[in-house]
Amino acid sequence: MVKAVAVIRGDSKVSGTVTFEQANENTPTTISWNITGHDANAERGFHVHQFGDNTNGCTSAGPHFNPYGKTHGAPEDDERHVGDLGNFKTDAEGNAVGSKQDKLVKLIGAESVLGRTLVVHAGTDDLGRGGNEESKKTGNAGPRPACGVIGIAA
Protein backbone atom coordinates (compact mmCIF):
# COMPACT_ATOMS: atom_id res chain seq x y z
CA MET A 1 0.00 0.00 0.00
CA VAL A 2 1.36 3.40 -1.03
CA LYS A 3 -0.09 6.49 0.68
CA ALA A 4 0.41 10.11 -0.28
CA VAL A 5 -0.88 13.50 0.84
CA ALA A 6 -1.07 17.03 -0.52
CA VAL A 7 -1.41 19.76 2.12
CA ILE A 8 -3.47 22.44 0.39
CA ARG A 9 -2.81 26.14 0.99
CA GLY A 10 -2.37 29.32 -0.99
CA ASP A 11 -3.03 33.05 -1.17
CA SER A 12 -6.67 32.58 -0.18
CA LYS A 13 -8.61 31.16 2.76
CA VAL A 14 -8.91 27.80 0.94
CA SER A 15 -6.96 25.04 2.71
CA GLY A 16 -7.09 21.36 3.55
CA THR A 17 -5.70 17.97 2.61
CA VAL A 18 -6.11 15.57 -0.28
CA THR A 19 -4.91 12.01 0.34
CA PHE A 20 -4.17 9.21 -2.12
CA GLU A 21 -3.95 5.44 -1.43
CA GLN A 22 -3.10 2.67 -3.89
CA ALA A 23 -2.68 -1.00 -2.96
CA ASN A 24 -0.66 -1.97 -6.06
CA GLU A 25 0.00 -0.84 -9.63
CA ASN A 26 -3.09 -2.58 -11.00
CA THR A 27 -5.66 -1.24 -8.53
CA PRO A 28 -7.55 2.07 -8.56
CA THR A 29 -6.32 4.86 -6.32
CA THR A 30 -8.61 6.13 -3.56
CA ILE A 31 -8.59 9.93 -3.41
CA SER A 32 -10.03 11.60 -0.29
CA TRP A 33 -10.37 15.31 0.37
CA ASN A 34 -11.10 17.63 3.27
CA ILE A 35 -11.16 21.21 1.96
CA THR A 36 -12.25 24.28 3.94
CA GLY A 37 -12.74 27.98 3.20
CA HIS A 38 -14.06 27.75 -0.37
CA ASP A 39 -17.26 29.23 -1.84
CA ALA A 40 -20.49 28.01 -0.22
CA ASN A 41 -22.76 25.53 -2.00
CA ALA A 42 -20.55 25.27 -5.08
CA GLU A 43 -18.84 22.74 -7.31
CA ARG A 44 -15.13 23.47 -7.62
CA GLY A 45 -12.57 21.84 -9.89
CA PHE A 46 -9.45 20.08 -8.66
CA HIS A 47 -6.68 18.54 -10.72
CA VAL A 48 -3.22 17.02 -10.54
CA HIS A 49 -0.88 19.37 -12.41
CA GLN A 50 2.38 18.51 -14.18
CA PHE A 51 4.99 19.98 -11.85
CA GLY A 52 5.65 19.82 -8.11
CA ASP A 53 6.81 23.44 -8.25
CA ASN A 54 5.11 26.17 -6.22
CA THR A 55 7.93 28.74 -6.54
CA ASN A 56 5.51 31.38 -7.84
CA GLY A 57 2.45 30.03 -6.10
CA CYS A 58 0.10 27.59 -7.76
CA THR A 59 0.76 28.96 -11.27
CA SER A 60 4.20 27.25 -11.24
CA ALA A 61 2.46 23.86 -11.23
CA GLY A 62 2.02 24.03 -15.00
CA PRO A 63 -0.77 22.34 -16.98
CA HIS A 64 -2.82 19.30 -15.99
CA PHE A 65 -0.80 16.08 -15.73
CA ASN A 66 -1.35 14.54 -19.16
CA PRO A 67 1.22 11.84 -20.04
CA TYR A 68 -0.98 10.35 -22.78
CA GLY A 69 -1.63 13.57 -24.76
CA LYS A 70 -5.42 13.52 -24.35
CA THR A 71 -7.90 16.40 -24.15
CA HIS A 72 -9.56 17.47 -20.87
CA GLY A 73 -12.53 15.43 -19.65
CA ALA A 74 -14.47 14.05 -16.72
CA PRO A 75 -12.92 11.43 -14.41
CA GLU A 76 -15.16 8.73 -15.91
CA ASP A 77 -14.32 9.64 -19.55
CA ASP A 78 -11.92 7.62 -21.70
CA GLU A 79 -10.65 10.90 -23.22
CA ARG A 80 -9.18 12.80 -20.25
CA HIS A 81 -5.96 13.91 -18.65
CA VAL A 82 -4.65 11.66 -15.86
CA GLY A 83 -4.91 14.74 -13.62
CA ASP A 84 -8.60 15.39 -14.31
CA LEU A 85 -10.33 14.75 -10.98
CA GLY A 86 -13.55 16.63 -11.74
CA ASN A 87 -15.32 18.70 -9.07
CA PHE A 88 -16.00 18.48 -5.37
CA LYS A 89 -19.15 19.94 -3.78
CA THR A 90 -19.00 22.39 -0.90
CA ASP A 91 -21.56 22.80 1.86
CA ALA A 92 -23.17 26.01 3.19
CA GLU A 93 -19.90 26.88 5.00
CA GLY A 94 -17.70 26.31 1.93
CA ASN A 95 -16.27 23.02 3.19
CA ALA A 96 -16.00 19.75 1.26
CA VAL A 97 -15.30 16.23 2.49
CA GLY A 98 -15.44 13.24 0.19
CA SER A 99 -13.66 10.46 -1.63
CA LYS A 100 -13.59 8.67 -4.96
CA GLN A 101 -11.67 5.94 -6.74
CA ASP A 102 -9.75 6.65 -9.94
CA LYS A 103 -8.27 4.04 -12.28
CA LEU A 104 -5.88 6.43 -14.09
CA VAL A 105 -4.35 8.18 -11.08
CA LYS A 106 -1.35 6.12 -9.93
CA LEU A 107 1.10 6.32 -7.03
CA ILE A 108 3.14 3.42 -8.44
CA GLY A 109 4.82 3.24 -11.85
CA ALA A 110 6.04 5.56 -14.59
CA GLU A 111 2.93 7.79 -14.60
CA SER A 112 2.86 8.32 -10.82
CA VAL A 113 1.39 11.56 -9.48
CA LEU A 114 3.93 11.62 -6.61
CA GLY A 115 5.87 14.88 -6.61
CA ARG A 116 3.26 16.67 -8.73
CA THR A 117 0.89 19.40 -7.51
CA LEU A 118 -2.77 19.04 -6.57
CA VAL A 119 -4.51 22.33 -7.45
CA VAL A 120 -7.89 23.44 -6.10
CA HIS A 121 -9.50 25.86 -8.57
CA ALA A 122 -11.74 28.89 -8.04
CA GLY A 123 -14.38 27.78 -10.56
CA THR A 124 -16.38 24.77 -11.67
CA ASP A 125 -14.73 22.32 -14.07
CA ASP A 126 -16.94 22.02 -17.17
CA LEU A 127 -15.37 18.57 -17.78
CA GLY A 128 -14.29 19.46 -21.32
CA ARG A 129 -17.87 20.13 -22.42
CA GLY A 130 -17.69 23.95 -22.53
CA GLY A 131 -17.59 24.19 -26.31
CA ASN A 132 -14.34 26.15 -26.56
CA GLU A 133 -10.61 25.48 -26.82
CA GLU A 134 -9.90 26.33 -23.15
CA SER A 135 -12.49 23.76 -22.06
CA LYS A 136 -10.48 21.04 -23.82
CA LYS A 137 -7.33 22.13 -21.90
CA THR A 138 -8.50 23.21 -18.44
CA GLY A 139 -12.25 22.69 -18.15
CA ASN A 140 -12.50 26.48 -17.66
CA ALA A 141 -11.95 25.84 -13.95
CA GLY A 142 -10.43 29.28 -13.41
CA PRO A 143 -7.76 30.63 -11.06
CA ARG A 144 -5.73 28.57 -8.59
CA PRO A 145 -6.39 29.82 -5.04
CA ALA A 146 -4.71 26.86 -3.30
CA CYS A 147 -2.48 23.88 -4.01
CA GLY A 148 -0.02 21.41 -2.52
CA VAL A 149 2.68 19.02 -3.71
CA ILE A 150 1.72 15.34 -3.47
CA GLY A 151 4.22 13.65 -1.17
CA ILE A 152 4.65 10.19 0.34
CA ALA A 153 2.69 9.86 3.59
CA ALA A 154 3.44 7.73 6.66
Curated annotation (Swiss-Prot):
One of its GO terms (molecular function) is superoxide dismutase activity. InterPro entries: SOD-like_Cu/Zn_dom_sf, SOD_Cu/Zn_/chaperone, SOD_Cu/Zn_BS, SOD_Cu_Zn_dom. One of its GO terms (cellular component) is cytoplasm. Substrate binds at residue 144. Keywords: Antioxidant, Copper, Cytoplasm, Disulfide bond, Metal-binding, Oxidoreductase, Zinc. Zn(2+) binds at residues 64, 72, 81, 84. It holds the Pfam family Sod_Cu. Its main location: cytoplasm. Residues 125-137 have a biased composition (Basic and acidic residues). It is found in: Cytoplasm. Belongs to the Cu-Zn superoxide dismutase family. Homodimer. This is Superoxide dismutase [Cu-Zn].
